[in-house]
Amino acid sequence: GEYMIRGLTVFTENIDDPAAAVAEVQAQLEKGPALLKNSVGIIACHYEFVLSGTAKAVCESLPFDVAGTISSLQAAGETRGTLLLTILILTSDDVSFKTLITSSLKDEPGKRIEESYKAASGGEKPSLIFAYAPFMLENSGDGYVEVLTRVSGGVPCFGTLAVDDTSDFRECYMVYNGEHYRDKMSLILFYGDVNPRFYLAAISENKLLDRAALITSSEGHILKEVNGRPVVEYFEDLGLTKASETSYAMTSLPFMLDYGDGTPMVSKVFIGLNEEKNAICAGIMPEGSTLYMGVFDKEDVLFTSGKIIAQALSEIENPSVLLGYSCISRNMSMGSDLFAEVDLIQKEIAGKVPALLAYSGGEICPTQINAAAAINRFHNNTFILCVF
């Protein structure tokens, strides 16, 4: 068919020899389809590639901008691995791409994103935004999404926060043209008729516990009371006190948040309890919304991801490119079977569509697109997919 955007993937496993990595990527480019007038690259790589200088060398060898993140596990085409550098190249004669990097988001992140966006877009409204950010505990993904939606006038946003495989997430960089950053966001702005399709897998409805909890007191992403009682009592009721007091065990307690405004529920996680025994959440918890705790397991992750990829491939005739991000918690639920989710998705794609898959520290994806504006959301525990 007639493709507005074509895609191809390149990869290297060569961490320590930048020249060899560049040669490998160039050879793959030469074998692939010719690049069209406008191109942009989306990178996902293990942090060792930025520390060794290989990511920088590879990006500098390419005649277009490259933006993306560190990831703990990547897949490109039919290759997958943890110690991998992958780039999905989007190329088009009709669609053009602008990239930007913000100033530091350490203070007033909303203001910094807004300034950078306005300068780069020059008042021209894009048709799609891809967003890439480091993992910064002090900033909320909801905050990023809220400001991008507002300043763009409701343009669909899709993207990811970085995630690594260290125990304390210390190497979670955003990567832009080969440089790596702990405190800046990059954006790819699309101009032209892109017509992306978005898909989202969270927990199956039958995995939700039927104990709804109305949020009666909260402050930003700190949850204080549900159903008029301290949140710690809610965990006691559910028999989850031990989990709630264990660092990182909280991330295996997903919940769906219903904002009560008719928009689809959004998957969120708890990060832990603070000294006051309030729950710290990965996202803003508005008073008056309702949360439904869920049960998270390998079987359901594979079921929901498999369902979404099969749906996308059956609904879209001749898809030209596929980009997917899956939450690190989905990967953790695989246990020792590290590649199970990626293998399932790659098997469905069967090499027919250029695809990049990577793990994520938080997913940005619209839950609805309507004529007026996209409802962009920040998710946890999800597998998100953008297909052209």
Question: In which residue ranges do the predicted regions lie?
Answer:
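Small-residue-enriched flexible segments
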Residues: Y3-V40, A44-D65, T69-G335, F339-E348, ...
